[in-house]
Amino acid sequence: MRVLIPLSLFAVAVSGQNSDLEGTWSSKSNQVFTGPGFYDPIEELLIEPALPGISYSFTADGYFEEAMYQVSGNPQDPKCPVAVLIFQHGTYEVKDDGQLVLTPIEVDGRQLLSQPCDDEGVSTYSRYYQAESFKSYLVQLDTYYGKQSLQLYGSDGAPLQPLFLAYKPPVMLPTITLNPTASDDAQPTSNAKRDLISHVRRSIENRHKTNAVKKTAPNIEKYWWGSLALIGVGSIAFLLS
């Protein structure tokens, strides 16, 4: 009996290592990406993308960055949706049991909350800090979309929305503390502050000069027909032998 399995069900799993996480991952909208295009730490600006979504970036040596743009409907008044933009970055660790733990730099997180029917058109800009923990994750090749995907699982084990590899190496802001405060243990000198601003500004100015390569989906249909042709040639050769 011949069993046909849809191509979309195939997924090649990749073992959980830091190098597998490396890159910038974005949700299906493909409009939200980490880096200076989402948050400008010099001007303290969160930049609204065209569509809602979420993006995570990871380096191979343990740093992460998060960009989130969410819009929630208001069932009581559909004309009053709530929108929020969130930026965080810091370090991450993959535990022995596969748990992925994100530890943000507390003073650097930012949130922009918009409630147009309650805030009189003035959004609320504030600091934001939220450590995150994922029970596990899976990096795999999703052959339906033809892209590497990152599946995160929440603390309860439930799968979250999949993310797809957009850039490798990742597009990120500098991994250092971007907005140190006077209460920090290591207070920067004036020269250090100037160096920090210069470093961040160069990152922003070079946003279009990154060596990160945008990942695009291969032509799956082309490989499908190519494989079919090879099978046909092989069958004819077998019958003639």
UniProtKB/Swiss-Prot annotation:
Localization: Endoplasmic reticulum membrane
Protein name: Protein ROT1
Topology within the bilayer: Single-pass type I membrane protein
Coiled-coil stretches noted in the UniProt entry, renumbered to this chain: none
Homology family: Belongs to the ROT1 family.
Molecular function GO labels: unfolded protein binding
Main location: endoplasmic reticulum
GO terms (BP aspect): 'de novo' protein folding; budding cell apical bud growth
Spans within the Cytoplasmic topological domain: 241
Topology feature Lumenal, residues: 17-222
Membrane-crossing segments per the record: 223-240
GO CC, alphabetical: endoplasmic reticulum membrane
Organism of this sequence: Kluyveromyces lactis (strain ATCC 8585 / CBS 2359 / DSM 70799 / NBRC 1267 / NRRL Y-1140 / WM37) (Yeast)
Signal peptide: 1-16
Keyword list, A-Z: Endoplasmic reticulum, Membrane, Signal, Transmembrane, Transmembrane helix
Domain of life: Eukaryota
Function text: Required for normal levels of the cell wall 1,6-beta-glucan. Involved in a protein folding machinery chaperoning proteins acting in various physiological processes including cell wall synthesis and lysis of autophagic bodies.
